């Protein structure tokens, strides 16, 4: 996917959440460990929810099209996040701790990208938009971490 505008970053973020949902759901079916299966099912449902939330955020942001049309290609290129999107996913061979760490790493990188974009922004509408999405992603990352810990404690 070519990233040129903030709208493209939002599409990319939504795609990451969607792919994590699909991979976690698939790996939950393939995993032999009941604990890992529970964790992957939770991650799948959480990522599906995040995909919907990002879509709603985009829809609401369309009313402020100036922010979404902001050019940010060179910022994205400096902070591109590698993600495994095709074929076999490593979740299939991971234990619960490794799954949790990998999932939180994806979210940490997404938060880092939005922090970087926010710090580079000078337009108030763009800064506000990024601040809102950043707050959402940070809150969801904390919720994900807390709930994964509770599943691990079962």
Predicted segments with their positions:
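Membrane-interacting alpha-helical segments
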Residues: 1-7, 84-97, 149-154
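Leucine-rich amphipathic alpha-helices with coiled-coil/heptad-repeat character
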Residues: 54, 58-61, 65, 118, ...
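Short loop-to-helix capping motifs
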Residues: 32-34, 123-124
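Preference for long, well-ordered alpha-helical segments
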Residues: 106, 110-150, 154
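Carboxylate-rich helix-loop segments that flank metal/cofactor sites and access channels
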Residues: 60-94
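Alpha-helical transition-metal enzyme core signature, strongest for iron centers
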Residues: 10-24, 40-54, 58, 107-110, ...
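Short alpha-helical linear motifs
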Residues: 34-35, 60-68, 151-154
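Alpha-helical bundle segments that constitute or directly flank the non-heme di-iron/ferroxidase center
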Residues: 1-31, 96-120
């Amino acid at each position: 996917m070519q990233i040129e505008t903030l709208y493209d970053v939002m599409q990319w973020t939504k795609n990451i959440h969607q792919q994590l949902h699909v991979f976690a759901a698939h790996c939950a079916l393939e995993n032999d460990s009941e604990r890992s299966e529970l964790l992957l099912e939770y991650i799948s449902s959480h990522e599906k929810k995040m995909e919907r939330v990002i879509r709603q955020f985009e829809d609401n942001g369309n009313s402020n099209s100036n922010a979404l049309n902001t050019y940010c290609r060179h910022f994205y290129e400096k902070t591109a996040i590698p993600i495994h999107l095709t074929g076999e996913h490593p979740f299939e061979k991971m234990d619960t701790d490794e799954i949790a760490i990998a999932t939180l790493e994806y979210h940490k990188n997404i938060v880092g990208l939005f922090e970087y974009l926010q710090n580079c922004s000078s337009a108030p509408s763009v800064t506000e938009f990024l601040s809102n999405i950043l707050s959402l992603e940070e809150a969801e990352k904390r919720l994900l971490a807390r709930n994964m810990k509770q599943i691990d404690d079962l």
